[in-house]
Amino acid sequence: MAEEVSSLMKATVLMRQPGRVQEIVSALRRGGGDRLQVISDFDMTLSRFAYNGQRCPSSHNILDNSKIISEDCRKELTELFHHYYPIEIDPHRTIKEKLPHMVQWWSKAHSLLCQQRIQKFQIAQVVGESTAMLREGYKMFFDTLYHNNIPLFIFSAGIGDILEEIIRQMKVFHPNIHIVSNYMDFSEDGFLKGFKGQLIHTYNKNSSVCENSSYFQQLRNKTNIILLGDSIGDLTMADGVPGVQNILKIGFLNDKVEERRERYMDSYDIVLEKDETLDVVNGLLQHILRQGDCVELQGS
């Protein structure tokens, strides 16, 4: 008889190797909260991809769709999206082939935003007026990590100021959260003049842009990782972590499901297909922390 996590029985759950997943989950459970850290993407991973059939905005979209952006700028940003997004998710191109296109996309978009005379105080307002939503079950997720002293490292190619404000407005911005993202750089008179540090895009989310060796050094006893992402580029987010013993990779498959399913199942341990909740992640956390409901099942 094998003990399994009941949330893994959800219809949205796909696993190429259920036995392997069970081994990793058992190892995470043996380590408990003391050994665990979570590394996650933000846009369309912690935030929702869609609600009632409507696409939800990413942190970039929130700004693109806001009234502080001119109509011309919005049009140009939309054109960039329609040109580059198909390249980003094209299953027939290698990451190496996509890289220069992603750099061009982010650089052009950031350059357009810097021409808009965006002011720092407008960020909270723009987020408040947006339709951004965190996935169902977000409060339990953020609170469970915080109350069990489990660090949450958010590695995002979005806009740091925006996603931080979303988490704040949802009242779950706890002290255990560390964010690496594209943060806005404001002039002394409060206008956006650029972005700080190295550009982070979908396909360089790894130790090359991560000036966080000291962050991970402090957590060197946290040798077990749950990684959450929604793109193939998210799989490298834990590359800068020293001494990893066990890592469980969970991928949200939100878009172009049919053509990307096989690749996701080859790459992620657990794939969540069109699942707008954090139920599976929360169920796993409860299980690892020995708080969860388990069902007895025949071994996988």
From Swiss-Prot:
Keywords: Acetylation, Cytoplasm, Hydrolase, Magnesium, Metal-binding, Nucleotide metabolism, Nucleotide-binding
Binding site residues for substrate: 156-157, 205
Residues modified as N6-acetyllysine: 256
The protein's name in its UniProt record: 7-methylguanosine phosphate-specific 5'-nucleotidase
Assembly behavior: Monomer.
Gene responsible for this protein: Nt5c3b
Chief localisation class: cytoplasm
Lineage of producing organism: Eukaryota, Metazoa, Chordata, Craniata, Vertebrata
Organism per entry: Rattus norvegicus
Residues that, per the record, bind CMP: 88
